[in-house]
Amino acid sequence: MHHHHHPCNRKPFTTIFSFFLLYLNLHNQQIIEARNPSQFTTNPSPDVSIPEIKRHLQQYGYLPQNKESDDVSFEQALVRYQKNLGLPITGKPDSDTLSQILLPRCGFPDDVEPKTAPFHTGKKYVYFPGRPRWTRDVPLKLTYAFSQENLTPYLAPTDIRRVFRRAFGKWASVIPVSFIETEDYVIADIKIGFFNGDHGDGEPFDGVLGVLAHTFSPENGRLHLDKAETWAVDFDEEKSSVAVDLESVAVHEIGHVLGLGHSSVKDAAMYPTLKPRSKKVNLNMDDVVGVQSLYGTNPNFTLNSLLASETSTNLADGSRIRSQGMIYSTLSTVIALCFLNW
């Protein structure tokens, strides 16, 4: 009797090899970061005074403003800070914590109320209290515009637009939302601009580094970047030691615009800090699961397109993923079928 062999039965090697490819792709990001020395330079115990630490904890919601805090509440605040930033939890102002406090970051407070059970869904991602999101007819279309008077002297407007188109595309590829650029700043859903110091929203910027940008929760749509930063799109061209990657910050702030808070996963786009001269432009699983739980899934999205996002150029409508994504999708579909039929 002729036995019909399933094509996968004889080929455990190819299956293992395909997994190795997927594994390589997952680890791409770590490899890229390892090549960038600024990601891994650890300061010796930095010199930060206790009053400065307390000010930082107040600014980001860990300690009440204008109130003298006792040692117990200071220690509790440090524990919450360490937990929210994925640091070793010691309750002490140790060198890991101080190095983190010195890093440039998003100006949005971290989600720190101890009573966040309803929003902290056991995952690392976080929503704003009450889970606000953009509620419109599906498929959701949001417009965005740049304030023409408030751009950055470091970049050409075409570069700024290109970077934001790419950053919006990252989110559009995983949720059923499309982002459309408009000239009309006044009526745009999402209003993007670079501002100096006090700019009228009660959240003044602080000059070079420190706070890089801030955003308001849905459905406000204001996305403000600190004009004092040396914004960069290409570190080969921009040599400044305090240069900040615009795309990394754009991806993060758009996450807030959509309703995500800060994540404690260091590789997530929604992690609050970003070192100067470093890039973090891809969504992490944590970001994807978080935003999909608010808006649902883009019908074109597959996990493999996320894995292949290193090499994809998603358009802002999220519809096109380059051929590499297709190869990975096909590979892993084949793998899945092999396992089902083994």
From Swiss-Prot:
EC code(s) of this entry: 3.4.24.-
Chief localisation class: membrane
Required cofactor names: Zn(2+)
Molecular function terms from GO: metalloendopeptidase activity; zinc ion binding
Keywords carried by this UniProt record: Cell membrane, Glycoprotein, GPI-anchor, Hydrolase, Lipoprotein, Membrane, Metal-binding, Metalloprotease, Protease, Signal, Zinc, Zymogen
Residues carrying sugar: 300
Cofactor binding note of this UniProt entry: Binds 1 zinc ion per subunit.
SMART domains recorded: ZnMc
pH dependence as annotated: Optimum pH is 5-9.
This protein's GO CC annotations: extracellular matrix; plasma membrane; side of membrane
Membrane topology note: Lipid-anchor; GPI-anchor
Ligand binding (Zn(2+)): 106, 252, 256, 262
Residue positions of the active site: 253
GO biological process, one term: proteolysis
SUPFAM superfamilies with a match to the protein in the record: Metalloproteases ('zincins'), catalytic domain (SSF55486), PGBD-like (SSF47090)
Activity under varying temperature: Optimum temperature is 45-55 degrees Celsius.
Subcellular localization, as worded in the UniProt entry: Cell membrane
Tissue specificity comment: Mostly expressed in flowers and stems, and, to a lower extent, in leaves and roots.
Propiece residue ranges: 35-124, 318-342
Keyword Iron annotated: no
CDD domains to which the protein is assigned, alphabetical: ZnMc_MMP
TM segment ranges: none
Activity-regulation annotation: Repressed by acetohydroxamic acid (AHA).
Motif Cysteine switch, residue range(s) on this chain: 104-111
Job of this protein: Matrix metalloproteinases (MMPs) or matrixins may play a role in the degradation and remodeling of the extracellular matrix (ECM) during development or in response to stresses. Active on myelin basic protein (MBP) and, to some extent, on McaPLGLDpaAR-NH(2) (QF24) and beta-casein.
The protein's name in its UniProt record: Metalloendoproteinase 4-MMP
Organism for this UniProt entry: Arabidopsis thaliana
Biological classification of the source: Eukaryota, Viridiplantae, Streptophyta, Embryophyta, Tracheophyta
This protein's encoding gene: 4MMP
